[in-house]
Amino acid sequence: MSKEDVIEVEGKVVEALPNAMFEVELENGHKVLAHISGKLRMNFIRILPGDKVTVELSPYDLTRGRITWRAK
């Protein structure tokens, strides 16, 4: 899957789950299960419930995603 195939959407973290997984509610109301991308993990970026995040979704599975950015 190339970089052009992903769908980027904004959302809000609803719940922090084990193993660096998060439940994120998207702007359109859907809830997805998302994990932290490698760059956020390497730089120890903390993500807490209530944070606004950018999520990348695969066109093949729209229920799972990757958190790529945390808004300030």
Swiss-Prot record:
GO terms for cellular component: cytosol. InterPro entries: NA-bd_OB-fold (IPR012340), RNA-binding_domain_S1_IF1 (IPR006196), S1_domain (IPR003029), TIF_IF1 (IPR004368). GO terms for molecular function: ribosome binding; rRNA binding; translation initiation factor activity. Its main location: cytoplasm. Disulfide bonds: none annotated. It is found in: Cytoplasm. It comes from the Bacteria. Residues 1-72 form the S1-like domain. Keywords: Cytoplasm, Initiation factor, Protein biosynthesis, RNA-binding, rRNA-binding. HAMAP family: IF_1. One of the essential components for the initiation of protein synthesis. Stabilizes the binding of IF-2 and IF-3 on the 30S subunit to which N-formylmethionyl-tRNA(fMet) subsequently binds. Helps modulate mRNA selection, yielding the 30S pre-initiation complex (PIC). Upon addition of the 50S ribosomal subunit IF-1, IF-2 and IF-3 are released leaving the mature 70S translation initiation complex. PANTHER family: TRANSLATION INITIATION FACTOR IF-1, CHLOROPLASTIC. Belongs to the IF-1 family. Component of the 30S ribosomal translation pre-initiation complex which assembles on the 30S ribosome in the order IF-2 and IF-3, IF-1 and N-formylmethionyl-tRNA(fMet); mRNA recruitment can occur at any time during PIC assembly. This is Translation initiation factor IF-1. It comes from Acetivibrio thermocellus (strain ATCC 27405 / DSM 1237 / JCM 9322 / NBRC 103400 / NCIMB 10682 / NRRL B-4536 / VPI 7372). The gene is infA.
